[in-house]
Amino acid sequence: MNAVSALDADEAHGAPRARRIGALALRLAKAALDTLYPPTCLACRAATDRHGALCPRCWSAMRFIERPFCERLGTPFEHDLGQGLISPQAMADPPAFGRARAVARFEDGPARTLVHRLKYSDRAELARPIASWMARAGADLLADADLLIPVPLHAMRLWRRRFNQAAALTAEISRRTGKPCNLAALRRIKATRSQVGLSRAQRAENVQGAFRIAEGAGVRGLNVVLVDDV
C-alpha cells in the first residue's frame, strides 16, 4: 500500500465519523432550540412533539378533502359512486379551468385559522406545511403541469399585506415538486373587493377584467397550474 492509498483509507474511515459528529451536532442544536422555543401546534398553540405540526386535536378537526370528489371542481361527494365522476354543478355550468383541487373544507377550525394567519398575521412560515398539503391534494394536477403561477394581489393590497401568500405557497410547492414557477406571469390590473361572502356568480363578476398575462411571460401552450390560498 502506498502513501496515497493509505491516505484514501484514512479518509474513508473518517467520513462516517464526521457524519456521526454532524448528526450529533444537529440533534444537540434541535434539543437546544426546543428548550428555548418549545414546539407548539400551528393552529391552537398546544404543545406538540415537533415544530411545524398540528396537535392531535387540530389534526382530527382538519376536514381534508379525499376521493370521492368531482374530478372537475374537486368538491367532495357524499357517497362513493366510482372514479372519474363529474358533479351536476360542473355539468350544468362548466368552469373555465380544467380541474381544481383543494386541501380541506374551508370552515371554522384549523384550516381557516392557518390560512388567516398566513394572510393577515405575517406568518409566512405557515406556507411550508400548507404547501406540503397542497402538493399532496393536487398531485394529479402537478404531474401534468408545465408551470406554476400564483394568483397575484393588486399593488395596493400587496403593500398593505407586505407579501403575497399565494406566491409564497407557489414557491414552496415548486421547491417540493421540482416544477418550475413564474411568480410574475400574471398581473392584477384592477383592484377588486374581497371575495368573502360572495356567491360564485358574484365572484366571477368581481374579478372580471382584473387580471392580465404579463408581457413576455411565455405561457402560451403550457399546462399551467394556478395557485391560490382559498
Q: What residue spans do the PLM features occupy?
A:
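Glycine-rich phosphate/pyrophosphate-handling loop used in enzymes and phosphotransfer proteins
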Residues: M1-V230
